[in-house]
């Protein structure tokens, strides 16, 4: 009662696609999979926090969080299973499609929406700090 079923279904679809991207990353290499898993875990943290509202409290929040975690894990395993024997071209194409979808979402939806709120210099600092952290992780894991 009071839960937006359409929003929850879309969230599960989004998280499933994120899981497939993580699985494709692990099929490419362990390093790629780890970088994608770390990067997308930040997105999933904020997605989970955004799902919590006044209409959803208590055990429903816990249940939704567990089901989202199972969703991303299951799709990661499926992506890795089906792409483990695939060639580099197929994996690269799937990763390119996934990255293009993520970039489209960021540029078309999130950046436009972000500029409707007053921007603070600390927000920009945290954005660039996040990029530097993930870039450093990739550099040091090589």
Language model: regions and residue ranges:
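Intrinsically disordered, metal-sensing/regulatory segments
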Residues: 1-142
């Amino acid at each position: 009662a009071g839960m937006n079923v359409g929003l929850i279904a879309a969230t599960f679809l989004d998280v499933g696609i994120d899981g497939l991207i993580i699985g494709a990353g692990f099929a490419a290499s362990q390093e790629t999979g780890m970088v994608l898993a770390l990067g997308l875990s930040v997105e999933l943290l904020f997605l989970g926090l955004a799902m919590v509202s006044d209409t959803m409290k208590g055990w429903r929040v816990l249940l939704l969080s567990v089901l989202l975690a199972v969703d991303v894990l299951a799709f990661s395993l499926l992506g890795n299973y089906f792409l483990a024997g695939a060639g580099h071209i197929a994996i690269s194409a799937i990763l390119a499609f996934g990255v293009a979808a993520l970039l489209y979402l960021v540029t078309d939806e999130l950046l436009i929406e972000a500029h409707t709120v007053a921007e603070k210099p600390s927000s920009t600092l945290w954005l660039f700090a996040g990029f530097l952290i993930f870039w450093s992780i990739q550099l040091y894991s090589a």
